[in-house]
Amino acid sequence: MFKTNVEQNNVPVFGSFESGQDLPEKRMNKESVDPRIAYQLVKDQLIDEGSARQNLATFCQTYMEPEAEQIMAETMEKNAIDKSEYPQTAKLESSCVNMLADLWNVDESEHYMGTSTVGSSEACMLGGMAMKFRWRSAALKNGLDIHAKKPSLVISSGYQVCWEKFCVYWDIELREVPMSEEHLSINTDIIMDYVDEYTIGIVGILGITYTGKFDDIMTLNDLVEDYNNTHDNEVVIHVDGASGAMFTPFVEPGLEWDFRLPNVVSINTSGHKYGLVYPGVGWILWRDKEYLPEELVFDVSYLGGHMPTMAINFSRSASQIIGQYYNFLRFGYEGYRQIHMRTRDGALQLSQAVAETGLFEIYNDGANLPIVCYKLKDDANVAWTLYDLADRLQMKGWQVPAYPLPKEMGNTIIQRYVCRGDLGQNMVTAFKNDLSESIEELNNAHILYHDVNTSKTHGFTH
Protein backbone atom coordinates (compact mmCIF):
# COMPACT_ATOMS: atom_id res chain seq x y z
CA MET A 1 0.00 0.00 0.00
CA PHE A 2 1.28 3.48 -0.90
CA LYS A 3 1.82 5.55 2.26
CA THR A 4 4.09 8.26 3.64
CA ASN A 5 6.43 9.00 6.53
CA VAL A 6 5.09 12.43 7.38
CA GLU A 7 7.44 12.74 10.36
CA GLN A 8 10.62 12.52 8.27
CA ASN A 9 10.46 15.86 6.46
CA ASN A 10 14.20 15.89 5.81
CA VAL A 11 14.51 12.38 4.47
CA PRO A 12 16.49 12.17 1.19
CA VAL A 13 14.21 11.72 -1.83
CA PHE A 14 15.73 8.37 -2.75
CA GLY A 15 15.87 7.31 0.87
CA SER A 16 12.14 7.85 1.27
CA PHE A 17 9.53 5.17 1.61
CA GLU A 18 7.73 6.40 -1.53
CA SER A 19 10.78 6.09 -3.79
CA GLY A 20 10.74 2.36 -3.15
CA GLN A 21 7.12 1.95 -4.26
CA ASP A 22 5.37 1.88 -7.61
CA LEU A 23 3.39 5.03 -8.30
CA PRO A 24 -0.38 4.67 -7.79
CA GLU A 25 -2.33 4.02 -10.99
CA LYS A 26 -5.83 2.91 -10.01
CA ARG A 27 -6.43 4.28 -6.52
CA MET A 28 -5.31 7.51 -4.90
CA ASN A 29 -2.76 7.09 -2.10
CA LYS A 30 -4.25 7.52 1.37
CA GLU A 31 -1.64 9.84 2.86
CA SER A 32 -0.03 13.00 1.55
CA VAL A 33 3.47 13.01 0.08
CA ASP A 34 6.22 15.54 0.70
CA PRO A 35 6.22 17.97 -2.27
CA ARG A 36 9.93 17.41 -2.98
CA ILE A 37 9.35 13.70 -3.26
CA ALA A 38 6.14 14.03 -5.27
CA TYR A 39 7.88 16.33 -7.73
CA GLN A 40 10.83 14.00 -8.25
CA LEU A 41 8.66 10.90 -8.60
CA VAL A 42 6.45 12.50 -11.25
CA LYS A 43 9.49 13.92 -13.05
CA ASP A 44 11.14 10.49 -13.08
CA GLN A 45 7.95 8.92 -14.42
CA LEU A 46 8.38 11.08 -17.54
CA ILE A 47 12.10 10.44 -17.95
CA ASP A 48 11.90 7.94 -20.81
CA GLU A 49 9.79 10.13 -23.10
CA GLY A 50 11.26 11.64 -26.23
CA SER A 51 12.86 15.08 -26.27
CA ALA A 52 10.25 17.65 -27.32
CA ARG A 53 12.89 19.75 -29.09
CA GLN A 54 13.84 16.76 -31.27
CA ASN A 55 10.24 15.98 -32.12
CA LEU A 56 9.97 16.82 -35.82
CA ALA A 57 6.51 15.25 -35.96
CA THR A 58 4.69 17.99 -34.09
CA PHE A 59 3.70 21.46 -35.26
CA CYS A 60 3.32 22.60 -31.65
CA GLN A 61 5.77 25.06 -30.14
CA THR A 62 8.31 23.49 -27.78
CA TYR A 63 10.27 26.56 -26.64
CA MET A 64 9.43 29.94 -25.17
CA GLU A 65 11.66 32.54 -23.58
CA PRO A 66 12.05 32.45 -19.78
CA GLU A 67 10.23 35.77 -19.46
CA ALA A 68 7.29 34.35 -21.43
CA GLU A 69 7.23 31.26 -19.24
CA GLN A 70 7.32 33.47 -16.16
CA ILE A 71 4.37 35.67 -17.13
CA MET A 72 2.38 32.60 -18.17
CA ALA A 73 3.16 30.82 -14.89
CA GLU A 74 2.11 33.91 -12.95
CA THR A 75 -1.27 34.04 -14.72
CA MET A 76 -2.26 30.38 -14.84
CA GLU A 77 -5.03 30.93 -12.27
CA LYS A 78 -6.86 33.49 -14.41
CA ASN A 79 -10.02 32.12 -16.03
CA ALA A 80 -10.21 33.38 -19.61
CA ILE A 81 -14.01 33.24 -19.66
CA ASP A 82 -14.37 35.49 -16.60
CA LYS A 83 -13.96 38.75 -18.47
CA SER A 84 -15.66 40.92 -15.84
CA GLU A 85 -13.29 39.68 -13.12
CA TYR A 86 -10.22 40.00 -15.37
CA PRO A 87 -10.97 42.95 -17.68
CA GLN A 88 -7.32 43.61 -18.53
CA THR A 89 -6.89 40.00 -19.62
CA ALA A 90 -9.97 40.41 -21.82
CA LYS A 91 -8.42 43.57 -23.23
CA LEU A 92 -5.23 41.68 -24.13
CA GLU A 93 -7.32 39.04 -25.90
CA SER A 94 -9.14 41.76 -27.83
CA SER A 95 -5.79 43.32 -28.74
CA CYS A 96 -4.60 39.99 -30.15
CA VAL A 97 -7.76 39.78 -32.28
CA ASN A 98 -7.14 43.32 -33.53
CA MET A 99 -3.54 42.52 -34.46
CA LEU A 100 -4.56 39.38 -36.33
CA ALA A 101 -7.25 41.30 -38.19
CA ASP A 102 -4.58 43.76 -39.31
CA LEU A 103 -2.17 40.96 -40.18
CA TRP A 104 -4.87 39.27 -42.29
CA ASN A 105 -5.84 42.50 -44.06
CA VAL A 106 -9.39 43.09 -42.88
CA ASP A 107 -10.94 46.05 -44.69
CA GLU A 108 -11.40 49.03 -42.39
CA SER A 109 -15.03 49.39 -43.50
CA GLU A 110 -15.94 45.95 -42.15
CA HIS A 111 -16.85 45.08 -38.57
CA TYR A 112 -14.72 42.05 -37.85
CA MET A 113 -15.22 39.74 -34.89
CA GLY A 114 -12.96 37.13 -33.35
CA THR A 115 -12.11 35.09 -30.32
CA SER A 116 -9.42 32.93 -28.79
CA THR A 117 -9.92 29.17 -28.53
CA VAL A 118 -8.02 26.24 -27.06
CA GLY A 119 -6.62 25.50 -30.51
CA SER A 120 -7.45 25.34 -34.20
CA SER A 121 -9.77 22.38 -33.76
CA GLU A 122 -12.19 24.44 -31.69
CA ALA A 123 -11.72 27.37 -34.05
CA CYS A 124 -12.58 25.16 -37.04
CA MET A 125 -15.71 23.97 -35.25
CA LEU A 126 -16.79 27.58 -34.76
CA GLY A 127 -16.05 28.48 -38.37
CA GLY A 128 -17.98 25.45 -39.59
CA MET A 129 -20.96 26.16 -37.36
CA ALA A 130 -21.12 29.77 -38.52
CA MET A 131 -21.21 28.60 -42.14
CA LYS A 132 -23.91 26.02 -41.39
CA PHE A 133 -26.18 28.43 -39.50
CA ARG A 134 -25.76 31.11 -42.14
CA TRP A 135 -26.48 28.61 -44.93
CA ARG A 136 -29.61 27.40 -43.15
CA SER A 137 -30.94 30.91 -42.77
CA ALA A 138 -30.32 31.72 -46.44
CA ALA A 139 -31.76 28.38 -47.60
CA LEU A 140 -35.01 28.97 -45.71
CA LYS A 141 -35.21 32.47 -47.14
CA ASN A 142 -34.76 31.07 -50.67
CA GLY A 143 -37.40 28.39 -50.14
CA LEU A 144 -34.97 25.45 -50.14
CA ASP A 145 -36.10 22.32 -48.28
CA ILE A 146 -33.32 22.02 -45.70
CA HIS A 147 -34.51 18.54 -44.71
CA ALA A 148 -34.32 17.05 -48.21
CA LYS A 149 -30.69 16.03 -47.71
CA LYS A 150 -27.69 16.78 -45.56
CA PRO A 151 -25.86 20.06 -46.00
CA SER A 152 -22.31 19.53 -47.26
CA LEU A 153 -18.82 20.89 -46.71
CA VAL A 154 -16.23 20.76 -49.50
CA ILE A 155 -12.55 20.27 -48.65
CA SER A 156 -9.37 18.61 -49.92
CA SER A 157 -8.91 14.99 -48.84
CA GLY A 158 -5.76 16.20 -47.08
CA TYR A 159 -7.86 17.77 -44.33
CA GLN A 160 -7.03 17.70 -40.63
CA VAL A 161 -9.21 15.31 -38.64
CA CYS A 162 -11.06 18.14 -36.86
CA TRP A 163 -13.08 18.70 -40.04
CA GLU A 164 -14.23 15.10 -40.06
CA LYS A 165 -15.22 15.52 -36.42
CA PHE A 166 -17.15 18.67 -37.26
CA CYS A 167 -19.12 16.93 -39.98
CA VAL A 168 -19.92 13.97 -37.72
CA TYR A 169 -20.90 16.13 -34.75
CA TRP A 170 -23.14 18.47 -36.74
CA ASP A 171 -24.48 15.99 -39.31
CA ILE A 172 -22.75 17.46 -42.36
CA GLU A 173 -21.77 15.55 -45.50
CA LEU A 174 -18.00 15.78 -45.93
CA ARG A 175 -17.27 16.08 -49.65
CA GLU A 176 -13.59 15.35 -50.19
CA VAL A 177 -11.83 16.54 -53.31
CA PRO A 178 -9.28 13.76 -53.91
CA MET A 179 -5.55 14.37 -53.89
CA SER A 180 -3.36 12.94 -56.66
CA GLU A 181 0.27 13.04 -57.76
CA GLU A 182 -0.64 16.03 -59.93
CA HIS A 183 -2.70 17.73 -57.23
CA LEU A 184 -1.22 17.46 -53.74
CA SER A 185 -3.42 20.36 -52.66
CA ILE A 186 -7.02 21.10 -53.58
CA ASN A 187 -7.78 20.40 -57.24
CA THR A 188 -9.30 23.64 -58.51
CA ASP A 189 -10.06 22.01 -61.87
CA ILE A 190 -12.81 19.88 -60.35
CA ILE A 191 -13.69 21.40 -56.98
CA MET A 192 -16.84 23.19 -58.14
CA ASP A 193 -18.25 19.83 -59.26
CA TYR A 194 -18.62 19.08 -55.54
CA VAL A 195 -20.62 22.25 -54.83
CA ASP A 196 -24.41 22.54 -54.92
CA GLU A 197 -27.20 24.46 -53.22
CA TYR A 198 -26.71 22.39 -50.05
CA THR A 199 -23.04 23.35 -49.69
CA ILE A 200 -22.46 25.42 -46.55
CA GLY A 201 -18.98 26.43 -47.65
CA ILE A 202 -15.55 25.44 -48.94
CA VAL A 203 -12.47 25.07 -46.75
CA GLY A 204 -9.17 26.21 -48.20
CA ILE A 205 -6.13 24.92 -46.33
CA LEU A 206 -3.05 27.10 -45.90
CA GLY A 207 -0.67 24.30 -45.01
CA ILE A 208 -1.99 20.78 -45.50
CA THR A 209 -1.08 18.64 -42.50
CA TYR A 210 0.19 15.73 -44.60
CA THR A 211 2.53 17.64 -46.90
CA GLY A 212 2.68 21.33 -45.97
CA LYS A 213 1.25 22.31 -49.37
CA PHE A 214 -0.98 25.38 -49.77
CA ASP A 215 -4.36 25.28 -51.45
CA ASP A 216 -4.64 27.87 -54.24
CA ILE A 217 -7.07 30.08 -52.36
CA MET A 218 -6.87 32.95 -54.85
CA THR A 219 -8.06 30.71 -57.69
CA LEU A 220 -10.63 29.20 -55.36
CA ASN A 221 -11.94 32.70 -54.63
CA ASP A 222 -12.36 33.40 -58.36
CA LEU A 223 -14.25 30.13 -58.86
CA VAL A 224 -16.56 30.92 -55.96
CA GLU A 225 -17.11 34.43 -57.32
CA ASP A 226 -18.22 33.01 -60.68
CA TYR A 227 -20.48 30.50 -58.96
CA ASN A 228 -22.13 33.11 -56.74
CA ASN A 229 -22.82 35.33 -59.74
CA THR A 230 -25.00 32.62 -61.29
CA HIS A 231 -26.62 30.97 -58.25
CA ASP A 232 -29.00 32.12 -55.53
CA ASN A 233 -27.26 30.19 -52.77
CA GLU A 234 -24.04 31.97 -51.89
CA VAL A 235 -20.98 29.82 -51.18
CA VAL A 236 -18.25 31.17 -48.90
CA ILE A 237 -14.67 30.19 -48.06
CA HIS A 238 -13.22 29.44 -44.65
CA VAL A 239 -9.41 29.33 -44.56
CA ASP A 240 -7.91 26.73 -42.25
CA GLY A 241 -4.67 28.53 -41.53
CA ALA A 242 -3.71 26.45 -38.50
CA SER A 243 -0.09 26.50 -39.68
CA GLY A 244 0.20 29.01 -42.48
CA ALA A 245 -1.83 31.95 -41.21
CA MET A 246 0.79 32.84 -38.60
CA PHE A 247 3.71 32.19 -40.94
CA THR A 248 2.90 33.42 -44.44
CA PRO A 249 2.10 37.06 -43.54
CA PHE A 250 5.67 37.47 -42.31
CA VAL A 251 7.59 35.68 -45.07
CA GLU A 252 5.35 36.13 -48.11
CA PRO A 253 3.11 39.13 -47.40
CA GLY A 254 2.25 39.59 -51.07
CA LEU A 255 0.48 36.23 -51.31
CA GLU A 256 -3.28 36.84 -51.36
CA TRP A 257 -5.06 34.16 -49.36
CA ASP A 258 -6.71 36.19 -46.59
CA PHE A 259 -9.43 38.84 -46.23
CA ARG A 260 -8.14 40.63 -49.31
CA LEU A 261 -10.15 37.98 -51.16
CA PRO A 262 -13.85 38.93 -50.95
CA ASN A 263 -15.20 35.40 -50.57
CA VAL A 264 -12.94 34.49 -47.64
CA VAL A 265 -15.25 35.12 -44.70
CA SER A 266 -13.39 33.47 -41.80
CA ILE A 267 -9.87 32.34 -40.90
CA ASN A 268 -8.54 30.22 -38.06
CA THR A 269 -5.00 29.70 -36.83
CA SER A 270 -3.06 28.02 -34.04
CA GLY A 271 -1.18 30.35 -31.76
CA HIS A 272 0.69 27.32 -30.48
CA LYS A 273 2.17 26.58 -33.90
CA TYR A 274 3.81 29.45 -35.76
CA GLY A 275 2.34 31.92 -33.27
CA LEU A 276 5.15 30.52 -31.08
CA VAL A 277 3.11 29.91 -27.91
CA TYR A 278 2.98 26.69 -25.88
CA PRO A 279 -0.20 24.62 -26.40
CA GLY A 280 -2.92 25.35 -26.44
CA VAL A 281 -4.30 28.54 -27.95
CA GLY A 282 -6.06 29.13 -31.24
CA TRP A 283 -7.82 32.03 -32.92
CA ILE A 284 -10.69 32.55 -35.32
CA LEU A 285 -11.78 35.76 -37.03
CA TRP A 286 -14.78 36.61 -39.19
CA ARG A 287 -14.32 39.45 -41.65
CA ASP A 288 -17.67 40.99 -40.67
CA LYS A 289 -20.27 40.33 -38.00
CA GLU A 290 -22.78 39.33 -40.71
CA TYR A 291 -20.82 36.07 -41.12
CA LEU A 292 -21.21 35.13 -37.45
CA PRO A 293 -24.92 34.41 -36.83
CA GLU A 294 -26.28 36.07 -33.72
CA GLU A 295 -27.54 32.78 -32.28
CA LEU A 296 -23.92 31.61 -31.92
CA VAL A 297 -23.05 34.51 -29.61
CA PHE A 298 -24.16 33.90 -26.03
CA ASP A 299 -24.55 36.39 -23.21
CA VAL A 300 -23.14 35.28 -19.86
CA SER A 301 -24.35 37.15 -16.79
CA TYR A 302 -23.60 34.84 -13.87
CA LEU A 303 -19.91 35.71 -13.67
CA GLY A 304 -20.63 39.22 -12.49
CA GLY A 305 -21.33 41.09 -15.71
CA HIS A 306 -22.98 40.72 -19.11
CA MET A 307 -20.32 39.36 -21.43
CA PRO A 308 -20.78 37.89 -24.92
CA THR A 309 -19.02 34.60 -25.61
CA MET A 310 -18.82 32.55 -28.79
CA ALA A 311 -16.31 29.84 -27.87
CA ILE A 312 -17.34 26.21 -27.36
CA ASN A 313 -15.13 25.68 -24.31
CA PHE A 314 -15.84 27.58 -21.13
CA SER A 315 -13.41 27.65 -18.21
CA ARG A 316 -9.73 27.60 -19.19
CA SER A 317 -6.58 29.36 -18.17
CA ALA A 318 -5.87 32.73 -19.74
CA SER A 319 -2.11 32.12 -19.56
CA GLN A 320 -1.80 31.09 -23.22
CA ILE A 321 -3.68 34.19 -24.34
CA ILE A 322 -1.30 36.29 -22.27
CA GLY A 323 1.61 34.34 -23.74
CA GLN A 324 0.34 35.19 -27.23
CA TYR A 325 0.15 38.88 -26.41
CA TYR A 326 3.63 38.72 -24.87
CA ASN A 327 4.98 37.30 -28.14
CA PHE A 328 3.25 39.97 -30.23
CA LEU A 329 4.73 42.66 -27.98
CA ARG A 330 8.14 41.01 -27.61
CA PHE A 331 8.80 40.09 -31.24
CA GLY A 332 6.76 42.59 -33.21
CA TYR A 333 6.38 42.09 -36.94
CA GLU A 334 10.09 42.22 -37.63
CA GLY A 335 10.93 39.71 -34.89
CA TYR A 336 8.41 37.21 -36.21
CA ARG A 337 9.76 37.73 -39.72
CA GLN A 338 13.33 37.06 -38.60
CA ILE A 339 12.38 33.89 -36.70
CA HIS A 340 10.25 32.52 -39.53
CA MET A 341 12.80 33.34 -42.24
CA ARG A 342 15.50 31.53 -40.29
CA THR A 343 13.15 28.59 -39.73
CA ARG A 344 12.44 28.42 -43.45
CA ASP A 345 16.16 28.51 -44.17
CA GLY A 346 16.60 25.49 -41.90
CA ALA A 347 13.86 23.64 -43.77
CA LEU A 348 15.48 24.43 -47.11
CA GLN A 349 18.79 23.09 -45.83
CA LEU A 350 17.13 19.85 -44.77
CA SER A 351 15.33 19.45 -48.09
CA GLN A 352 18.62 20.01 -49.92
CA ALA A 353 20.26 17.33 -47.78
CA VAL A 354 17.41 14.95 -48.59
CA ALA A 355 17.66 15.72 -52.31
CA GLU A 356 21.43 15.20 -52.37
CA THR A 357 21.02 11.57 -51.33
CA GLY A 358 19.41 10.88 -54.70
CA LEU A 359 16.97 8.47 -53.03
CA PHE A 360 13.93 10.65 -52.49
CA GLU A 361 11.30 12.55 -54.42
CA ILE A 362 10.50 15.76 -52.59
CA TYR A 363 6.86 16.82 -52.38
CA ASN A 364 7.42 19.96 -50.33
CA ASP A 365 10.81 21.64 -49.92
CA GLY A 366 9.88 24.07 -47.14
CA ALA A 367 9.85 27.23 -49.23
CA ASN A 368 6.19 28.07 -48.56
CA LEU A 369 5.88 26.57 -45.08
CA PRO A 370 8.90 25.02 -43.28
CA ILE A 371 7.63 21.49 -43.78
CA VAL A 372 9.85 19.02 -45.65
CA CYS A 373 7.96 16.10 -47.16
CA TYR A 374 9.21 13.34 -49.47
CA LYS A 375 8.85 9.73 -50.57
CA LEU A 376 11.33 7.09 -51.68
CA LYS A 377 11.86 7.17 -55.44
CA ASP A 378 10.42 4.21 -57.30
CA ASP A 379 13.92 3.39 -58.57
CA ALA A 380 15.68 4.01 -55.24
CA ASN A 381 16.84 0.37 -55.18
CA VAL A 382 17.06 0.04 -51.40
CA ALA A 383 15.82 -2.81 -49.21
CA TRP A 384 14.62 -0.55 -46.41
CA THR A 385 11.53 1.62 -46.09
CA LEU A 386 10.76 5.04 -44.67
CA TYR A 387 9.47 3.28 -41.57
CA ASP A 388 12.94 1.79 -41.12
CA LEU A 389 14.51 5.21 -41.56
CA ALA A 390 12.13 6.66 -38.96
CA ASP A 391 13.15 3.91 -36.52
CA ARG A 392 16.83 4.54 -37.15
CA LEU A 393 16.44 8.29 -36.59
CA GLN A 394 14.51 7.62 -33.40
CA MET A 395 17.52 5.69 -32.10
CA LYS A 396 19.39 9.00 -32.39
CA GLY A 397 16.65 10.87 -30.51
CA TRP A 398 14.70 12.28 -33.48
CA GLN A 399 10.98 11.68 -33.83
CA VAL A 400 10.18 11.71 -37.54
CA PRO A 401 6.87 10.32 -38.82
CA ALA A 402 6.35 8.09 -41.84
CA TYR A 403 2.78 7.52 -42.97
CA PRO A 404 0.54 6.95 -46.02
CA LEU A 405 -1.12 9.81 -47.86
CA PRO A 406 -4.94 10.02 -47.75
CA LYS A 407 -7.25 7.47 -49.35
CA GLU A 408 -6.70 7.73 -53.12
CA MET A 409 -2.92 7.91 -52.53
CA GLY A 410 -2.88 5.47 -49.62
CA ASN A 411 -0.17 3.35 -51.26
CA THR A 412 2.24 6.28 -51.19
CA ILE A 413 4.31 6.38 -48.00
CA ILE A 414 5.87 9.71 -47.15
CA GLN A 415 8.07 11.16 -44.45
CA ARG A 416 7.74 14.66 -43.01
CA TYR A 417 9.88 17.08 -41.00
CA VAL A 418 8.19 19.99 -39.24
CA CYS A 419 10.73 22.76 -38.70
CA ARG A 420 9.74 25.05 -35.84
CA GLY A 421 11.14 28.29 -34.51
CA ASP A 422 13.33 26.49 -31.97
CA LEU A 423 15.18 24.41 -34.58
CA GLY A 424 18.48 26.29 -34.51
CA GLN A 425 21.36 25.85 -36.94
CA ASN A 426 23.21 23.51 -34.61
CA MET A 427 20.19 21.20 -34.55
CA VAL A 428 19.80 21.42 -38.34
CA THR A 429 23.44 20.39 -38.76
CA ALA A 430 23.09 17.59 -36.22
CA PHE A 431 19.99 16.25 -37.95
CA LYS A 432 21.64 16.31 -41.38
CA ASN A 433 24.55 14.30 -39.98
CA ASP A 434 22.22 11.84 -38.26
CA LEU A 435 20.17 11.44 -41.44
CA SER A 436 23.27 10.67 -43.47
CA GLU A 437 24.52 8.19 -40.86
CA SER A 438 21.12 6.51 -40.61
CA ILE A 439 20.91 5.97 -44.36
CA GLU A 440 24.46 4.59 -44.43
CA GLU A 441 23.67 2.24 -41.54
CA LEU A 442 20.53 0.98 -43.28
CA ASN A 443 22.36 0.47 -46.56
CA ASN A 444 25.07 -1.56 -44.80
CA ALA A 445 22.75 -3.52 -42.53
CA HIS A 446 22.53 -7.29 -42.82
CA ILE A 447 18.99 -8.16 -43.84
CA LEU A 448 17.22 -11.15 -42.31
CA TYR A 449 14.44 -12.44 -44.57
CA HIS A 450 11.74 -14.12 -42.52
CA ASP A 451 10.09 -16.11 -45.31
CA VAL A 452 11.45 -16.43 -48.82
CA ASN A 453 8.08 -17.61 -50.12
CA THR A 454 6.18 -14.47 -49.13
CA SER A 455 6.68 -10.76 -49.52
CA LYS A 456 9.88 -9.80 -47.77
CA THR A 457 9.76 -8.30 -44.33
CA HIS A 458 13.03 -7.64 -42.66
CA GLY A 459 14.83 -6.54 -39.56
CA PHE A 460 18.40 -5.38 -39.09
CA THR A 461 21.24 -6.89 -37.11
CA HIS A 462 23.94 -4.77 -35.59
UniProtKB/Swiss-Prot annotation:
Catalytically driven reaction(s): L-glutamate + H(+) = 4-aminobutanoate + CO2
GO CC term (a single one): cytosol
Secreted as UniProt keyword: no
Cofactor(s) needed for function: pyridoxal 5'-phosphate
Cross-referenced Pfam families: Pyridoxal_deC
Gene3D superfamilies with a match to the protein in the record: 3.90.1150.160, 4.10.280.50, Type I PLP-dependent aspartate aminotransferase-like (Major domain)
InterPro entries assigned: Glutamate_decarboxylase, PyrdxlP-dep_de-COase, PyrdxlP-dep_Trfase, PyrdxlP-dep_Trfase_major
N6-(pyridoxal phosphate)lysine: residues bearing it: K273
EC numbers on record: 4.1.1.15
Example GO BP: glutamate catabolic process
Regions annotated as coiled coil: none
Sorted UniProt keywords: Decarboxylase, Lyase, Pyridoxal phosphate
GO molecular function: aromatic-L-amino-acid decarboxylase activity; glutamate decarboxylase activity; pyridoxal phosphate binding
Lineage: superkingdom: Bacteria
Xref: SUPFAM superfamilies: PLP-dependent transferases
CDD domains: DOPA_deC_like (cd06450)
Family of this protein: Belongs to the group II decarboxylase family.
Described function: Converts internalized glutamate to GABA and increases the internal pH. Involved in glutamate-dependent acid resistance in gastric fluid.
Listed name of the protein: Glutamate decarboxylase alpha
Organism: Listeria monocytogenes serovar 1/2a (strain ATCC BAA-679 / EGD-e)
Primary gene name: gadA
